[in-house]
Amino acid sequence: MGSPKKNENKGFFAAMTSGFSMFGTAVSRSVNGVQGNEGVEVINPEGGKEDAEEEAQKGRWKDEERDSYWKMMQKYIGSDITSMVTLPVVIFEPMTMLQKMAEIMEYSHLLDQADECEDPYLRLVYASSWAISVYYAFQRTWKPFNPILGETYEMVNHGGISFISEQVSHHPPMSAGHAENEHFIYDITSKLKTKLLGNSVDVYPVGRTRVTLKKDGVVLDLVPPLTKIHNLIFGRTWVDSPGEMVMTNLTTGDKVVLYFQPCGWFGSGRYEVDGYVYSAAEEPKIMMTGKWNEKMSYQPCDAEGEPLPGTELKEVWHLADVPKNDNFQYTHFAHKINSFDTAPAKLLASDSRIRPDRYSLEQGDLSKAGSEKHSLEERQRAEKRTRETKGQKFTPRWFDLTDEITPTPWGDIEVYQYNGKYNEHRDTAESSSSASNETDLKSIEFNPWQYGNISTE
């Protein structure tokens, strides 16, 4: 068993690579691109003058800033730069990593369908399509803010979901998240790891993602591919996620293996995803194909991976309408995440929405966003010094560190488990308060801090 790329000598994907399948080939797309056909994006992997000019028009890098950061970044080549480099606010988006974690819930109805599905293989089609759907949002090239230790993000009013995420560690940076509705439970512990390669950076999704489908108690485990950010400083920045995504049904042993094609010149292969749902006996049952920025489809297949006679390709997911010319390439759902429409009553003061640097950037005030970001970082350093002086440790509020260590392709990760206290908090908040309006919520002062006025500690 393996990815389609590893099975090129047989089955449905052999037809793809030989050039006569109904999905076409990367070669034909490249030729079409040379001929000037519309719809093909010409990608220069190394960047170029035109790309640099396009980035400059976005207001991200001035020439003097670009040169200065290039000189600074050279000494970090080969290093994990997750939290060791202070970056200018001009390259940030008005969202934190905790909020970005919630973007995977946009198409949560696919998990509802997976829970209701009786077919164990089709169930994996729904669930893996849900996992793919977030990659449209992941292609944004703006950097989200690193959460402050103890920062949280809450979301309600979407698909019956209650979502909570919390920054549980600062060094190394780690976040934990939990979401639940009547159909599923979602849990994630994330410890992103990076490697600077000069003008590009690899982002390794070190973490553990589990989905429990409530109807049958099925537990799904997700291992996503790495992400590559190209032309970080010079050229037009773009994002790719080449490699395998594997979702395993830990209850039955069935799994789906999807291969994200790497992007080549003229955009060949970019966005394409192909793979199979396998039984526990490693026999292909359903083939899947599509583009992570558009749609996914599936079709039952035989033991050789060929479509079964009398069946047809069926769409399982497609991208919802997105805003045109959005400043940060946000989807409508991303705007909902930032809004107070999805905020619960008695919003926690540690919530990312009311973080002053994020909010200032959202309002277009880069100068204030930069100064607020600096103030928060200085306060966090002061808290760390106070914590060390007192001989104390930070304890997350909504998640508990377990003894479990989970291996990943990019290193081990300590697992944080949702402790259930947020449910109790929400029940109390909703029963004891009237609904707050947006003005009331905006008046809350951002407070993720462990200590009070640390200058007097």
Curated annotation (Swiss-Prot):
Q: In which tissues is it expressed?
A: Expressed in roots, leaves, stems and flowers.
State any single GO MF term: lipid binding
Annotated InterPro entries: OSBP_sf, Oxysterol-bd, Oxysterol-bd_CS
**Where along the chain is composition biased (Basic and acidic residues)?**
47-61, 370-391
Could you say which protein family the record assigns here? Belongs to the OSBP family.
Q: Which region ranges are annotated with the description Disordered?
A: 37-61, 363-393
What protein name does the entry list? Oxysterol-binding protein-related protein 3C
Give any single GO term for biological process: lipid transport
Looking at the record's lineage, which domain of life comes first? Eukaryota
What Gene Ontology cellular-component terms does the record carry? cytosol; plastid
List UniProt keywords, sorted A-Z: Lipid transport, Lipid-binding, Transport
Tell whether Transport is among the UniProt keywords. Answer: yes
- List the taxonomic lineage: Eukaryota, Viridiplantae, Streptophyta, Embryophyta, Tracheophyta
Coiled-coil boundaries:
none
According to its UniProt entry, the function of this protein is described as: May be involved in the transport of sterols.
